[in-house]
Curated annotation (Swiss-Prot):
Residues 223-303 form the bHLH domain. Residues 237-303 are annotated as: Helix-loop-helix motif. It comes from Gibberella zeae (strain ATCC MYA-4620 / CBS 123657 / FGSC 9075 / NRRL 31084 / PH-1) (Wheat head blight fungus). The gene is GRA2. Gene3D superfamilies: Helix-loop-helix DNA-binding domain. The keyword DNA-binding applies. This is Transcription factor GRA2.
Length: 338
C-alpha cells in the first residue's frame, strides 16, 4: 500500500503567523500601559486587537475617580416621633372584656358568663398613665382557668357537629355518592365488591397483529452502516499523513543544523540510539518512526529553552524602549515651553 504524501504547503500559514507576531510587537511598542507579563513562554502571543483593548482598559482604570469612603461616625437621622413618649395610648379595659370576645349562642349556656368566673372581684384590669404592668395572667384564678378550658372544649365540639350537619344535606341533594360510605355499607351487608371487566372481542387480537405488521412494513429501512475496516483504513490514512508531515519537518530541521555546523566538531560524531552518528543518519535517507519521534522531542525541548531566553530579552528591550520614549517626550515638552 503506497503511503500518502502530504501535499499541503506550510508557507502561507508561516507568513500569516509571522505577520501576526510583527503586528503584536508593534502594538506592544505603541501602547505603554500594557503590562509585559502577558508575554510568557509556552503561551501564544496576544493579538494586536487584544493588546489595544488591554491598553484601553488600563487607561480607563487610571482615569477613573476614587470612590469616596463614608465614615461610620456620620450621624444617623432618626424620626423624633419614634422616641417621643408624649403620644402613648391610654387603654381602659372593662371587667367583662373576656366574655365579650366570645360570641357563644349555645343551648347549654344561654346567658353570658358572669365576670366572677373569669376575674377575681377585688381585682380590676385597667391600665393607667403611671402603670406599665402588662402581666395579665395574675388576674386569673385556677377555677376560672378550668372553666375557660371546659367552655372552649364545648364550643369546639359543637362547631364540628354543626359543620357536619350543614354539609350532609348538600351531599344528599346533589346526589353525589361518597365512596367510603358505599364501601362500608357493602362490606357491612356482606356483599362482595366486584370489579367490572370489559369483554374482549374474538377478532381484536388478530386485528392488532395485522396493524402492527403493516406499521413495521411501512418503516424505512435501516441505514447501511460503514464497515469497521473502512473506518480503520480512513483513520490510519489520516494518521500516516500527519506523521509524514512531521517526518519532513524533522528532516529539514536536521539538514539545516547539519549545514550550519562547523567541520571537525564533536557534534558530528554524536551517536544516536542505534549506534550510528547523526550525520551518517542524515545522509542515509528516511528515518523510521522511533527516530522521528525522538528527534521531534529533542527539537521541541530546544525550542522551549530558546523561547524562554528570547522572551526575557524582548521584555527587557521593550522596557528600555519605553524609558527612552518617555525621556524624549519630556525633552520635547521642555523645548516647546522654552
Amino acid at each position: 500500500m503506497p503511503k500518502p504524501q502530504s501535499k499541503r504547503s506550510s508557507l502561507p500559514n508561516y507568513i500569516k503567523s509571522r505577520g501576526e507576531l510583527i503586528a503584536s510587537l508593534q502594538a506592544l511598542l505603541a501602547n505603554d500601559h500594557v503590562d509585559l507579563e502577558i508575554l510568557r513562554s509556552g503561551v501564544p502571543w496576544p493579538s494586536a486587537t487584544e493588546i489595544v483593548q488591554l491598553s484601553q482598559v488600563s487607561e480607563s482604570n487610571e482615569d477613573a475617580p476614587v470612590a469616596a469612603c463614608h465614615s461610620s461616625n456620620e450621624p444617623v437621622v432618626v424620626d423624633p416621633a419614634l422616641g417621643d413618649d408624649s403620644h402613648q395610648a391610654h387603654i381602659d379595659l372593662d371587667v367583662n372584656w373576656l366574655s365579650n370576645l366570645i360570641p357563644y349562642n349555645g343551648d347549654e349556656l344561654s346567658e353570658q358568663p358572669d365576670s366572677s368566673l373569669f376575674c377575681s372581684p377585688p381585682e380590676r384590669m385597667s391600665v393607667s398613665d403611671s402603670s406599665n404592668n402588662t402581666d395579665y395572667l395574675s388576674h386569673f384564678s385556677s377555677s376560672s382557668i378550668c372553666q375557660w378550658d371546659n367552655l372552649l372544649d364545648s364550643i369546639g365540639s359543637q362547631t364540628f357537629q354543626d359543620t357536619i350537619n350543614v354539609l350532609s344535606p348538600h351531599c344528599q341533594d346533589s346526589g353525589v355518592s361518597q365512596p367510603s360510605n358505599l364501601a362500608d355499607d357493602t362490606l357491612g351487608q356482606g356483599q362482595p365488591v366486584s370489579t367490572v371487566v370489559q369483554p374482549q372481542h374474538p377478532g381484536s387480537t388478530e386485528r392488532d397483529e395485522s396493524v402492527s405488521s403493516i406499521a413495521s412494513s411501512q418503516e424505512s429501512p435501516r441505514k447501511r452502516q460503514r464497515p469497521h475496516y473502512a473506518i480503520e483504513k480512513r483513520y490510519r490514512a489520516g494518521l500516516q499523513e500527519r506523521f509524514e508531515a512531521l517526518r519532513d519537518c524533522v528532516a529539514s530541521l536536521k539538514k539545516t543544523q547539519h549545514e550550519q555546523r562547523l567541520p571537525g566538531t564533536n557534534e558530528d560524531l554524536a551517536e544516536g540510539d542505534d549506534g550510528g552518528s547523526v550525520s551518517d543518519r542524515a545522509t542515509v535517507g528516511r528515518m523510521n518512526k522511533a527516530e522521528v519521534l525522538n528527534q521531534a522531542t529533542l527539537c521541541i525541548r530546544q525550542l522551549q529553552e530558546e523561547n524562554e531566553v528570547v522572551m526575557e530579552y524582548i521584555k527587557l528591550l521593550i522596557k528600555q524602549f519605553r524609558v527612552m520614549k518617555q525621556a524624549m517626550q519630556q525633552a520635547l515638552k521642555v523645548d516647546i515651553n522654552s
